[in-house]
């Protein structure tokens, strides 16, 4: 089974997300949107469109919960439901929820470091 096919997003906590976004815009040329992040569009498998999101969050965000880590990486996968089932069978910590939105379908897996 094909597992990870790419990176969908990089999300991290910052002391001042707006100022940090401005720094990345001004010094590295990121096209930081009004919502605080940047989108990197690309062509996906078989030419399907895809994107990678870069976005800082406030230090007190609950977005990465239940992880206490200051960052989260979203991976693109070929078949989310099959991968989550395989990871559960392998003894990995897989949260019991998935979400579907216009951005895609999401599941959460905690690596050994949380």
Segments (PLM) and residue ranges:
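Sterically constrained small-residue positions within well-ordered secondary structures
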Residues: 1, 47, 64-66, 100
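Vicinal oxygen chelate
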Residues: 1-15, 35, 60-114
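Core segments of cupin and vicinal oxygen chelate
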Residues: 1-5, 11-54, 89
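Short linear motifs in intrinsically disordered
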Residues: 28-31, 76, 96-99
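A solvent-exposed interaction/effector surface
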Residues: 50-52, 57-64
């Amino acid at each position: 089974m094909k597992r990870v096919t790419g990176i969908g997003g990089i999300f991290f906590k910052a002391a001042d997300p707006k100022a940090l976004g401005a720094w990345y815009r001004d010094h590295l040329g990121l096209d930081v949107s009004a919502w605080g992040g940047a989108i990197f569009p690309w062509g996906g498998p078989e030419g399907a469109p895809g994107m990678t999101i870069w976005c800082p969050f406030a230090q007190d965000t609950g977005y990465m919960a239940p992880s206490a880590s200051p960052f989260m990486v979203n991976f693109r996968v070929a078949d989310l439901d099959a991968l989550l089932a395989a990871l559960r069978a392998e003894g990995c910590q897989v949260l019991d929820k998935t979400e579907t939105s216009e951005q895609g379908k999401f599941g959460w897996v905690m690596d050994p470091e949380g």
